[in-house]
């Protein structure tokens, strides 16, 4: 069963990469109760990024434990042979990297045919112009604000102007494409990412490294709401 896609203005997507895997079911239930909108699942192959994590079997297990949409991020080379595996496992959103896919239009179309929402991710040094040709095929753009592979890194501030540029491209296209930021997101800096134009926020240690997930997520929402309001007012002027 694919989780129902909810649609609040701003979404928090806790990354289970930073969860306690010995208590993964409990952790997933806890972040759902704490007010998460998505659950972010990082899949790493040890080639595209220097780390090896999980696959469809864990996604399937997480799917059984929550009704939230599963936001699955494939940090892997040649993801195409595995798309149907993640669809069967229960992924709601499946994101591939522009740097890792040869025929991006075809891959995104196949993700949609399999009943999932299609996402495209860019590494910090990848120029935004590379995603413009596929905006009609994407439901979500994920901007990495750290170099992918490991949790607990600090946000690269130079990524913020890139988020602004991608937001401009999305507005120009006139499609409801979500703009997600992933890497180093915490209570203290989530407002800057929202001000730049992001509307989905992945946070691993920024949530799972705190004592009270609900308090942390509530604080994040307080920090993003005024920032987005300020940004919208400037666009209207």
Ranges and model annotations:
Residues 99-101, 123-124, 146-149, 205-208:
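Short, acidic/turn-prone active-site loops that include or flank metal/cofactor-
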Residues 1, 227-237:
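Short, low-complexity, charge-dense intrinsically disordered segments
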Residues 191-192, 200-201, 208-210:
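Catalytic cores of soluble, metal-dependent hydrolases
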Residues 179-184, 202-206:
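Glycine-rich beta-strand-to-loop/alpha-helix junction loops that act as flexible
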Residues 2-95, 100-103, 110, 117-118, ...:
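Conserved N-terminal beta1-alpha1 strand-loop-helix module at the mouth
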Residues 91-99, 194-203:
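Short, electropositive alpha-helical surface patch
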Residues 184-196:
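Acidic, divalent-metal-coordinating active-site segment for phosphoryl/phosphodiester hydrolysis
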């Amino acid at each position: 069963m694919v989780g129902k896609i909810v649609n609040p203005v701003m979404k928090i997507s806790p990354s289970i990469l930073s969860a306690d895997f010995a208590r993964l079911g409990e952790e997933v239930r806890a972040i759902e109760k704490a007010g998460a909108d998505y659950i972010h699942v990082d899949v790493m192959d040890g080639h595209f990024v220097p780390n090896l994590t999980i696959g469809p079997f864990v996604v399937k297990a997480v799917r059984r434990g929550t009704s939230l949409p599963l936001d699955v991020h494939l940090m892997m080379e040649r993801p195409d042979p595995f798309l149907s595996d993640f669809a069967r496992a229960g992924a709601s959103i499946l994101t591939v990297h522009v740097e890792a896919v040869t025929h991006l239009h075809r891959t995104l179309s196949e993700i949609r045919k399999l009943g999932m929402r299609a996402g495209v991710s860019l590494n910090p040094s990848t120029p935004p112009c590379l995603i413009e040709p596929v905006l009609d095929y994407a439901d979500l753009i994920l901007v990495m604000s750290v170099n992918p592979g490991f949790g607990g890194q600090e946000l690269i501030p130079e990524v913020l102007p890139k988020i602004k540029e991608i937001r401009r491209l999305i507005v120009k296209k006139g499609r409801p494409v979500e703009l997600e930021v992933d890497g180093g997101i915490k209570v203290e800096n989530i407002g800057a990412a929202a001000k730049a134009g992001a509307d989905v926020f992945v946070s691993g240690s920024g949530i799972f490294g705190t004592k009270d997930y609900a308090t942390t997520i509530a604080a994040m929402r307080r920090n993003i709401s005024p920032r987005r309001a300020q940004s919208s007012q400037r666009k209207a002027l």
